[in-house]
From Swiss-Prot:
UniProt KW Secreted keyword: no
GO BP: phospholipid biosynthetic process
UniProt similarity note: Belongs to the PlsY family.
Name recorded for this polypeptide: Glycerol-3-phosphate acyltransferase
Metabolic or biological pathway, per its Swiss-Prot or TrEMBL entry: Lipid metabolism; phospholipid metabolism
Single GO MF annotation: acyl-phosphate glycerol-3-phosphate acyltransferase activity
Classification via Pfam families: G3P_acyltransf (PF02660)
Transmembrane segments: 1-21, 57-77, 85-105, 126-146, 165-185
Record membrane topology: Multi-pass membrane protein
UniProt KW Transmembrane helix keyword: yes
Purpose: Catalyzes the transfer of an acyl group from acyl-phosphate (acyl-PO(4)) to glycerol-3-phosphate (G3P) to form lysophosphatidic acid (LPA). This enzyme utilizes acyl-phosphate as fatty acyl donor, but not acyl-CoA or acyl-ACP.
Amino acid sequence: MAFLISALLILIGYLLGSIPTGYLTGLHLKGIDVRQHGSGSTGATNILRTIGKRAAIFVLTVDLAKAMLAVILVKLWFFVESPEMIPLEWKSWLVVFAAIAAVLGHSKSIFLNFTGGKSVASSLGVLLVLNPIVALGTLGSFLAMLSLSRIVSLSSITGVVAVNVLMFGLHQPLPYCLFGVIVGLYVTFRHRTNIIRLLQGTEPRLGQKLQQEGS
């Protein structure tokens, strides 16, 4: 029973992460598939480029919330149910598995043929529940780099570094540290085309559009 319930909680995490907020926003507000515009991502940055600021704020907020909910549901389970259902020792690991599932769902949504965003907002949403101090430190590093460079992708990668420094520096539980490493590598991989443009000096700054649609 413990394995079945754990699998269900992880599945719920994935399905929550898979809710295609950016895609639905583009469809509702402009009648477009945002995957065919800008960077092709359904995340808030591409929504900002293709639709506008208010839509981007909405998408960012919902993407944060759905990832937070995926983790909160696991924590609530251990709060309201008897440890006999799922061993208490599983808690940190199950929280992290559900968190990773939510992050994966955001970028590989089952509702969008396994396409989606780049999992930055969903990762931050998870961190806000796992450890708000780590989340705020990560957000601070992101905003600091953004203010200096005006490049979202570079700021996101800076945030990845900050997550891992803070997780290990604050001696967080092993599952949380592994979350930082695994998701950090995944988010960096999702930004591989951005990294190429950064090296070429062609990565757009905040407010600019890509020179080539779908790039």
